[in-house]
From Swiss-Prot:
Covalent S-S links between cysteines: C80-C125, C174-C185
Keyword Secreted: no
Protein's name according to its UniProt entry: Aspartic protease inhibitor 4
InterPro entries: Kunitz_inhibitor_STI-like_sf, Prot_inh_Kunz-lg
Places the protein is found: Vacuole
Length: 220
């Protein structure tokens, strides 16, 4: 019996030595998995649907709240409403419904998409439903959000939805061409935060360096 145990130990010894040597000196490097995309959720905890409409609701209360809506830009000669605004209070009117149009089939966090006001309109104003970022406003020294964008093919019309560091979500503007003029696009992904600036007494969505707008999405 003792002889059998001795022989068994001799047989196992090379395996144990090889295993220890391989583990300590030559670890197995398994390929790292790509992070699973996280779906963006609405106020009911449902995943956003590209075929549904949503109101963009500011999380703040009182003067810090207010839905996002389509309105006429001050001093604009556009034939249709062409500005992206936020109402001055959370007890104000309901916002204008929007539709999120992803480059893929689903709406995930931190992925490129277009935003479109989803409302009936005349043929002349069809393109004035699509969000974009305008040129640098010399008076306000910022870039204002406006409409007149192009779905799926314009640097000025690409956005992302990311988790807020506080609560809810933030909107980012992310042109895919690095040479595109965007002095506010300073993070590693060449994106800029969307916040609020005051234009002629109205709260206008604009690119900001700090204090991004925290929002939720309510299905219409």
């Amino acid at each position: 019996m003792m002889k059998c145990l001795f022989l068994l130990c001799l047989c196992l010894l090379p395996i144990l030595v090889f295993s220890s040597t391989f583990t300590s000196q030559n670890p197995i490097n398994l390929p790292s998995e790509s992070p699973v995309p996280k779906p963006v959720l609405d106020t009911n905890g449902k995943e956003l649907n590209p075929n549904s409409s949503y109101r963009i609701i500011s999380i703040g209360r009182g003067a810090l709240g207010g839905d996002v809506y389509l309105g006429k830009s001050p001093n604009s000669d556009a034939p249709c409403p062409d500005g992206v605004f936020r109402y001055n209070s959370d007890v104000g009117p309901s916002g204008t419904p929007v539709r999120f149009i992803p480059l893929s089939t689903n709406i995930f966090e931190d992925q490129l998409l277009n935003i479109q006001f989803n409302i009936p309109t005349v043929k002349l104003c069809v393109s004035y439903r699509n969000w974009k970022v305008g040129n640098l406003n010399a008076h306000l020294w910022t870039m204002l959000l406006e409409t007149g964008g192009t779905i799926g093919q314009a640097d000025s019309s690409y956005f992302k939805i990311v988790k807020s560091s506080k609560f809810g979500y933030n909107l980012l503007y992310c042109p895919i061409t690095r040479h595109f003029l965007c002095p506010f696009c300073r993070d590693d992904n060449f994106c800029a935060k969307v916040g609020v600036d005051i234009q002629n007494g109205k709260r206008r969505l604009a690119l900001v360096s700090e204090n991004p707008l925290d929002v939720l999405f309510q299905e219409v």
